[in-house]
């Protein structure tokens, strides 16, 4: 879309993603003088322009970051208010948190989550508006502490279950078969040295560490920092105890 905005003529993108971020980018490009139609549908049409002009624009809240903070409350069985959020962008996520037994209350652009006991549930990643693959790993940390057995199926990316081995180091009971993980919840996780193998796996390790007994050391912060701004500071502000080490060894 960005390349097509300044290309000669008309560009048609078929099988386009339906994610809110795509719609938001189209709105920004239109505000800068481009002509984009169809964002939010499988077909997007872009009529390029010679130049774009400046504009003031507020991007939508990060739904994956919001989901991560909701999970931080759920995995620690806490109450937390997260905002600003657009609940419609988190529909599949909120449905699963509701299945888990969390209480969710919306107040304008804020969501308050309360969690006491987490029940097992199944999930399958799907393109938006389905369950986001970017929250599969963080949700698996939650399911590792749930009551009962859960099944997680990853349908979007290959090799996106590498965090399973790291959760197992913390005492999680998980069996893998292809792109499917079967998680038997345990009463407590145990702190351990772990490594985030990608952006969302790193966040999953931090969440697991919040709920674990003892100290958890997470490596792979180069991945974490690519998708979260000052994650540890935000979590510490609501009661976490996280220190960033220059050399965790």
Task: Enumerate the predicted regions with their spans.
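Short, structured segments at the rim of ligand-binding sites
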Residues: 1-249
